[in-house]
Amino acid sequence: MITDTCILHIEEVLELLPHRFPFLLVDRVLNFEKGKFLRAVKNVSFNEPFFQGHFPGKPIFPGVLILEAMAQATGILAFKSMGKLAPGEFYYFAAIDEARFKRPVQPGDQMILNVEFIKERCGVARFKGIATVNEEMACEASMMCARRKEI
């Protein structure tokens, strides 16, 4: 179980991210430093709607949603690092590279999302993300998000 100080509760996460149930995949932020890193939690519950079909009798958290959870964590770090958006702007998930899956994530797991700010240029930020369960790597990827006008 995590014993770190909770820095951002769900109410604050909801203020930063546009996602809502069933697509909000960050439950709380444990720690962050602007322009450096963010550590967040996703508690994986059997009640998640996708477990009905992924996979019946052997529920596994979809890998694409692990990546989405890390992308949402990078979005929070981007908001905290690069500041508030101007009217009509939005942070878009722009790219993912070198994604690797190392272990399945299952109901009952607590997934820790660690994202690290690498660099920012012209409104495009690069991040490194690692998702772990019980300190064992489940997924890693390089990601980018872009600050752009809303489409």
From Swiss-Prot:
Report what the protein is called: 3-hydroxyacyl-[acyl-carrier-protein] dehydratase FabZ
Gene Ontology BP, a term? fatty acid biosynthetic process
Name the enzyme's class: lyase
Q: What is the lineage of its organism?
A: Bacteria, Pseudomonadati, Pseudomonadota, Gammaproteobacteria, Enterobacterales
Q: Which UniProt keywords apply?
A: Cytoplasm, Lipid A biosynthesis, Lipid biosynthesis, Lipid metabolism, Lyase
Enumerate the CDD domains for this protein: FabZ
Recorded catalytic reaction(s): these are: a (3R)-hydroxyacyl-[ACP] = a (2E)-enoyl-[ACP] + H2O
Q: What does the function comment of this entry state?
A: Involved in unsaturated fatty acids biosynthesis. Catalyzes the dehydration of short chain beta-hydroxyacyl-ACPs and long chain saturated and unsaturated beta-hydroxyacyl-ACPs.
GO molecular function, a single term? (3R)-hydroxyacyl-[acyl-carrier-protein] dehydratase activity
Family per similarity comment:
Belongs to the thioester dehydratase family. FabZ subfamily.
